[in-house]
Amino acid sequence: VSKVRVLPLGGLGEIGKNMTVVEHDGRIVVVDVGLRFPTPEMVGIDLVLPDFSYLRERASDIEAIVVTHGHEDHLGALPWVLRELGATQMPPVYGGALTIAMARSKLDEHKLKEVELNEVEDGEELELGPFTLELVHMTHSIPDASAVALGTELGTVLVTGDYKFDQTPVDGPPADVSRLAELGREGVLLLCGDSTNVDRDGFSPSESVVGPHLEEAFARCEGRIVVTSFASNIHRVQQVVDAAAALDRKVSLVGRSMRKNVGIGRTLGHIEVPDGMLVGPREINDFPDERVVIISTGSQGEPLSALRRMAYRDHRQVELREGDTVVFSATPIPGNERAVNETIDRLYHIGCDVVTPRDAPVHASGHGYAEEIKLMLNLVKPRYVMPFHGDFKRLRLHAQLAEAVGIAPENTYQGENGLPLDIDERGARFGSPEQSGMIFVDGVEIGEMADVALRDRRMLSADGIFIIVVTIAEQDGRSMAEPEVIFRGVPFLDEADELIEEIRSTVEDTIERAAKDRITETDVVQDMLHDDMAKLVYDRLKRRPMVLPVVVEV
């Protein structure tokens, strides 16, 4: 019996790290390979990837990786995934022109040269094993965004990627509504649709409304202007450049990813900058304040981003000062609100004026609102619906919208990462869960991280560490030297000498008790020391630093 399996490995029940496995006749196409950024609780973690163990075991069955667009939550994990899969067989990668250019740049950074990268024109049909592949042009906050239509014997699996129905886009034509309708008439088996803004009524504003409001905001500013947005939001960068040109201001790009993406955008003709307008960050001070616009990364409060460093006066090239205006031309991704608010607060402390989308229409979402999601459902008329790209609340709301436009509730499947949807001629049903979850990137290391490791990092960052080194006799467990007490990062330790003496006294009492009870095993003695020290430190400080006893036998 012919069967199609759709297995989301990321992007359901969360915002970010989108990754979907579509399987048919024993062959696999992977749609998107995204990452997400760590929450504040993930201390020391740089990036979070989907757990792609399922793909590692099936590497030789993968026909291709197809990427809907060039945002990090859809493309960012590509180097790590390819490096892991390449040991068996390096799958080819397909996407639009800008998407492939960004993929190439990312792979070059990771020194991955032996990857087959294929640009696909909208409407072009390719054969990938038992699948046909077509990219359908969509509008989003980045050029060359596409929906992925995978044809199978049972019908088309349509993964929308991120989209909105923008009738007046700033770059290129509107979404290919006629092709979506044609696919609907031909037979869409399953629609996997973007749920990001399902909780917002009506239609999303067009990207083209942002430009005039940016120019209006710029005209009110007498000092320097810093605009922060996603580095991949090529359309927004163009509108900032246009607004700056209208007011005869120079533009400087700050942030490595901003410079890289703008360079790619200019090469492909998506960004046009007048000659002599761009200046380097070190040249900003050569011009009067009223003639400078800085376009910076950091709209999400990322710890190492350019704007965050400016806000904390830690940027080597740009020093913000009173009278500067910072325009947030982006809204926080769910989960980033705290980091963004902290950045804004630091900017106010410096004396900057801050403009956010709450103050003026300086941002338009790249994701369609509820009426656009209804339009997608009505255009493609899918047999089955599986909401994608959202937390569980948004997935539920998307399912309710599907029912509202006439799709039977039993044909709408609210899934989660790792839960495959199996479809054959008899119907659709969830299969047995597959391994899914998070893979952490910590510096150059990549792998799973146990909850205990993250808990230890949180404990160290919040309350510090005490290390107690004791030397005991191998024969009878007696103390052979005065205990050594070392502490780092322990807050509010005003009377350190007094506490250290108390710790030493308690340690000696514990060692004496262990020797008296003929306990000489070092691991048991360490446990006794840990319990006694942790209790003492909590009683004195009302905090729980990590306590690490070290027992040396002589």
Residue ranges and their predicted role:
Residues 1-66, 71-286, 305-319, 338-342:
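His/Asp/Glu-rich metal-coordinating catalytic cores
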Residues 518-554:
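C-terminal tails and terminal domains of large nucleic-acid-associated
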Residues 121, 416, 543-547:
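Short Gly/Ser/Thr- and Asp/Glu-enriched loop/turn motifs at secondary-structure junctions
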Residues 14, 142, 288, 460-462, ...:
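Solvent-exposed loop and beta-edge segments used for protein-protein assembly and interaction
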